[in-house]
């Protein structure tokens, strides 16, 4: 099994944009939270790695997203389950690999939603998710011009695949981001410096 330090170094080999690094760290934290709260605590490290590496190919191969990932992940001998999860998060958009495991379904569902949450958080006086309530997130979600690059349809399909309501997915994602926000911010600043704070 690849270790976290190796995975982070590999992520940074192919991703230089602060936004992409922040997003990867965020998904890592969220996926660890989901594992620990959904009955998969013994797999938390693996779920987190899938979150960290899910967009490994996006920055340098945006037109071949999820297609180049297996090639890049092979460089660190990533296990097949990790490769499958990374490819499955783009199901129906840039991949025909279907998310089947609960971990893959959470990754698929939370990927786009975390983008909306972070965009909303950065507009708040606190610049934080700690004081963000569900009703505030729902308002931003309904405004399709806000964080327009984050697909509401994909998020809705993600909730459906998990067998939960959209509100429940939002609540779980908010909780996961509250749990990891401080650690993500600390590591992101260490990697990118304060200059990447508002990227």
PLM features per residue range, with description:
Residues 12, 36, 74, 142, ...:
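Short polybasic/polar patches that bind polyanions
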């Amino acid at each position: 099994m690849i270790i976290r330090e190796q995975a982070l170094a590999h992520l940074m080999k192919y991703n230089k944009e602060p936004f992409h690094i922040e997003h990867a760290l965020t998904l890592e934290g969220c996926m660890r939270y989901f594992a620990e709260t959904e009955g998969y605590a013994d797999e938390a490290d693996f779920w987190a790695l899938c979150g960290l590496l899910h967009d490994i190919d996006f920055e340098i191969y945006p037109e071949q997203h999820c297609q180049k990932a297996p090639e890049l992940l092979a460089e660190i001998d990533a296990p097949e389950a990790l490769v499958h999860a990374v490819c499955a998060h783009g199901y129906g958009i840039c991949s025909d690999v279907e998310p089947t495991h609960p971990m893959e379904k959470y990754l698929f569902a939370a990927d786009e939603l975390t983008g909306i949450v972070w965009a909303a958080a950065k507009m708040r006086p606190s610049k934080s998710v700690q004081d963000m309530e569900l009703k505030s997130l729902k308002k931003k979600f309904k405004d399709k011009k806000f964080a327009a690059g984050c697909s509401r349809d994909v998020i809705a399909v993600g909730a459906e695949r998990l067998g939960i309501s959209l509100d429940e997915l939002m609540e779980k994602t908010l909780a996961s981001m509250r749990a990891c926000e401080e650690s993500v911010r600390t590591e992101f600043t260490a990697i990118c410096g304060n200059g990447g704070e508002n990227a």
